[in-house]
Structures are given as C-alpha cells and as structure tokens.
Amino acid sequence: MLSLIIPAKELDECLFETIYNYTLTFNHDYEIIIVYDFTDKKVYEKFNNNFNNNKKIILLLSPIKGRINALNYGYTQSKGDIIKCIDADDTLLSSYFDELEIMDNYSAHCHNASLIDGNNKVIGTYTFEKNILFKDYQYVLSNLKSPPRWVWSFNREIAECIFPIPPELFAEDVWFSLIIKKNCNKIFHLNSEVYLYKQHDGGEWGGVKNFSAEVMSLRARWNLKLIPVLLKNKISLGIVSDDIFSNIISYYKVLLNKKSISNIILSKTTIYYKAKLFLIMYSPSLATLLISIKWLVSKQLIAIKKS
C-alpha cells in the first residue's frame, strides 16, 4: 500500500478538489494522510462530510504547527509499505501508479514533473538530476543536491532512516535527498512527468526557474542555515569532516553579497561554482533558459544510459 502524506497549512477548496479527484482516479491500494495546521469550520465540514466514510482519506490536525512537524506526525500515522510526501497545491497523476510495482525491486523511486502556473497550465518540465542517480554519495553530500521531496517514494526501511526529520531544518528537501542517496543501493528513476508541480512567483523559494538576485540571496541565506543542522547529524549523514561543505558555503556567501566580479574571482570555491555565480548574477535570464535545456538534455541522457 502507498501512504501519501500531504502537509497543509490549512484545508481549502483547492485541496478538497484535488483529494476528490484522487478518489476518482486512484484505483490502487493507497491511503492519503492530510496533516493540517488549521482550517475554516465550513471547509472542514465539507471534507468531513465527503470523506468521513472513506477509510483511505485521513484528516489529522497537527499537534505542532509547521511543515516538518506535519510530515513527522503524518509518518507516525501511516501504514503503507511505500511512503510518498507531496505538496498540497500540487497533483500526483494516476500514471504514477503504473510503475509502482517496480518498487519491490528498489528501496527508492523518483520521477520527473510538469511545471504548471496558477491556472494549471503546463509551462515547462522538470527532470530529476541525473548526477544524483549516477554519482556517489560524497558528491551529492558536498554539493547539497536536493530535488524537491515530492520526487521521492521509498519503502519503510528507508523511511525509518528519514523520520523523524530534524524539526530545526528550514527545509526538508536536502534531508530526503541525502538520507535516500546514502542508504539506497539502487534508485529507480521513472523518466516521465507523473506530477504537476505548481509554480508560485511569490512562493517560499520563488519558483524553480527563478534566478533573480532577490530570490537567490534568500535561497543562499536559508541554505546556509541548513548546514549547522546537518553537521549536528553527522552520524546519520556519514559526515567525516566539516570541510565537506566549504565550496558550497563559499558559493552561498557570494550570493549574499552585492554583485561583484572580484568577489566571484576571489571566492574560495571551485571553478564550476564561480562560473555558476557569473551566470546567475550577471545573466539570470540566461540561467533560466539553460536550466530548461539542461532538464531536456538530462531526460535524454538518462534514457540513453538506462537503455
């Protein structure tokens, strides 16, 4: 059985429509666990009246507010052999289930997504990063490779390594990525778009293709806050030396400063990160174009390597 855990700040009409559609299109063994911080009484009654007799839909008021606390609590209430944690404003397509049985042969499973705007119009695609699949754990760790957590599905053995997520983390994506890469011998990649990933220009991370100075500075600040928490969990993450993050820390620190060629050149990071800094800081629109091309190429390269 699949346990689909959805953290939500509140129960709303959009989430209701999404869950209702799931009940119409999901024909496999599943449970949907929605963990919310608060809700309007009328909306709650709508959820309750429609799903109260459906044992597959579980509504839980989180005992502690916050996304990570909701995920942790949701997992404790789950019963599935496979766990997946998605976002309340996104959509998992029923085609995802076509490959679910292959999870019997893999500890973890990942996939691509279609990017949609606020009107649910497809505006692009997101391809899972091939380096996470084909490079070693130290590469993923040192570069803090962290695709969105919704890309992942994993068995309970891996889930026991992931949960509880350290509640002091600002964002949990990197925790999922590192724990899964470290503990999985094999990861299956479904090289197709089985998820609709909604983009919000004013969202927490600014949209996956947004490389504006303001957004990149915020991301850098938030990511720097993650590192001390990761270092507190050295054993779980297999961190041998604090220096493993030195290049990525230097990269983030440059992003926090005003645009300066000298800051980039003199930064104590790799040539790769210096080139990335020049691109993002001096031509963010080109960075947006190149990431789109990268995802298209990655999809083809992954297909070739798997064939």
What is the role of each PLM region?
Residues S62-S78:
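Glycine-rich, basic loop-to-helix element that forms the pyrophosphate-binding segment
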Residues L24, L169, K182, K198-S307:
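C-terminal subregions of glycosyltransferases and related glycan-biosynthesis enzymes
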Residues I83:
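Short aromatic/hydrophobic "clamp" motif used to bind/position activated sugar donors
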